[in-house]
Amino acid sequence: MGLDTLSNSLKDAMKKLAGKTVIDRAAVDELVRDLQRALLSSDVNVKLVMELSKQIKARSLDEDLPKGINAREHVLRIVYQELVNLVGKEAEFSLKPQKILMAGLQGSGKTTTTGKLCRYFQRKGLKVGAIGADNFRPGAYAQLETLCKKINVPSYGDPKEKDAVKIVKDGLAALKDVDVIIVDTAGRHALEDDLIDEITQVNAYLNPDHRWLVIDAALGQAARDQAKRFHEAIGIDGVIVTKMDGTAKGGGAMSAVAETQSGIVFIGNGETIDDLERFDPNGFISRLLGMGDLKALVEKAEESMNAEDVDVNAMLRGKFTLNDMYKQLEAVQKMGPLKQVLSMLPMGNMNVPSDALEGTADKMKKFRIIMDSMTPQELDEPALINTSRMIRVAKGSGSSVEEVRDLIKYYKMMQKTLKGFRGNRMAMGKMMKQMQKGGMGPMGPM
C-alpha cells in the first residue's frame, strides 16, 4: 500500500532503460509511457503528467550530453530532476521560538499531527507546548492532551469554552515559558463558511509565524482545491501530507499541493508519534527511485542513538560486545519501521518482500528479549556463554536454546563484519565523501 506501487513502477521503468544498449527516441518514448502509467495510477493530474512527459522528451533528445556521463545516465538524471519539480519545493522554517497555526478539514489527522510536531520540536531541543482550540469535535482536546502527556509536553484547552480566540488567548498566557506554540484548530466535513471565519479570526489574533495545512493523502489531486481555499483565507506557507503509508494517491496529493506554490513541510507516514518526516524533495524522489536518502538516514540515526551510547571507534578496533549490539538494535527500533529505514539506503531495484521485513523486525525484538535475560558479565563477555548458560537464558526469556544460539551466531557475524570495516576504514571514508557531495549526490550509484 502507500507509495510502494508507484515506487516499484518507477524503478521498473528506470531499470528497463538502464538495460537498453542504445538510448534513442524509441527508448525515450517507451520510458515516458512507463512513467505516465505509473504517475496516473497514483492519481497525478493528467495535465501535469503530460507536461512532465514533454519536458523529459525534449530535454533527453535535445540537450547536449554533459561531460563525464553517458546518454543513459543523462536521461535518468533528467527523469530525477523533473520528478523533483513535480512534487514541488520544501517549505522552509527555522528551529527557533515561533507560533504555528494548524489548519485542515476534520479527519485529516490534524490533532495527531499536532502531537507529532510537538515531538519533532522537542527532539530538536526546544521547549514546546500545544493549544487545543478545536471545540467543534467532541474529545478533540482530550486526544491532544493524551498525546502531549505521553511525551511530557504541556498543553492547554478548555472544552467548555466555545470562543476559539479566547482559548488561544488563555493558552498563550498559560504557555508563556515555551519556545514553540502549536495551535490545533477546528475542522469540518467540508470547507464551510463558519470554519473559514473562525480560523481567520484565530489567525488574526495569534499572528503566527507559520500557517500549516494538514491534508489527507487519500484526497489525491482533490487536495489542490482545499489547499487553494485555505491559502486564500489565511495564507498557508506549508503543507503536511498525512497517511502517506495508507493510500496509492499520495503522489497525486503532493503534486496537487505543489501547484498551489505552498511547499510541503512534513509527510506523515505511520501511526506512532515519531512517524513524521521532514520533507526534502530530492531525498523523497531518490527513495522512490530506489536510490536511497542518506541524509535522512544519518539524521534519523543521530536522533536515535546518542554519541555516548556506543563507542564506534572501540567497535572498529575489535571491541564489540553483546551490550553494544543491544544498543544498536534499540537504536534501529527507535528509527522507525525497518521498511522505512531500508528505503533510505541506495538499494536500486532490489525489493525486499514485506513478510521478510516483518520477520527480521520480529527477530530483532526477540534478540533483545533474550539479552534482557543475560547477566551484565555475559553481555560484556559473550565468550562466557556456554551450553548451560544458554539453557538458563532460554528459560528466563521464554525462548528455545536454538533461538539463543541464533543470537550468538548473529553477534559473531556482526563482530566479523566490523573487523572487516576496520581494515577498510580509508576506503569507507572515501566512499562516504563521494556520497555526501552536493548537487546530484543520490544519483551516484546509477
UniProtKB/Swiss-Prot annotation:
Q: Which GO terms describe its cellular component?
A: signal recognition particle
SMART domains hit by this protein = AAA, SRP54, SRP54_N
Going by the record, the broad EC class of this enzyme is: hydrolase
Query: Would you say which domain of life the source belongs to?
Result: Archaea
User: What are the alphabetically sorted keywords of the record?
Assistant: Cytoplasm, GTP-binding, Hydrolase, Nucleotide-binding, Ribonucleoprotein, RNA-binding, Signal recognition particle
One of the protein's GO biological processes? SRP-dependent cotranslational protein targeting to membrane
GO molecular function terms listed in the Swiss-Prot or TrEMBL record: 7S RNA binding; ATP hydrolysis activity; GTP binding; GTPase activity
EC number(s)?
3.6.5.4
Q: Where in the cell is it found?
A: Cytoplasm
By its UniProt entry, which Pfam families does this protein fall under? SRP54 (PF00448), SRP54_N (PF02881), SRP_SPB (PF02978)
Q: Which InterPro entries match?
A: AAA+_ATPase, P-loop_NTPase, Signal_recog_part_SRP54_M_sf, Signal_recog_particl_SRP54_hlx, Signal_recog_particle_SRP54_M, SRP/SRP_N, SRP54, SRP54_GTPase_dom
| SUBUNIT field | Part of the signal recognition particle protein translocation system, which is composed of SRP and FtsY. Archaeal SRP consists of a 7S RNA molecule of 300 nucleotides and two protein subunits: SRP54 and SRP19.
- Which family is this protein grouped under? Belongs to the GTP-binding SRP family. SRP54 subfamily.
What is the protein's given name? Signal recognition particle 54 kDa protein
Organism of origin is Methanocorpusculum labreanum (strain ATCC 43576 / DSM 4855 / Z)
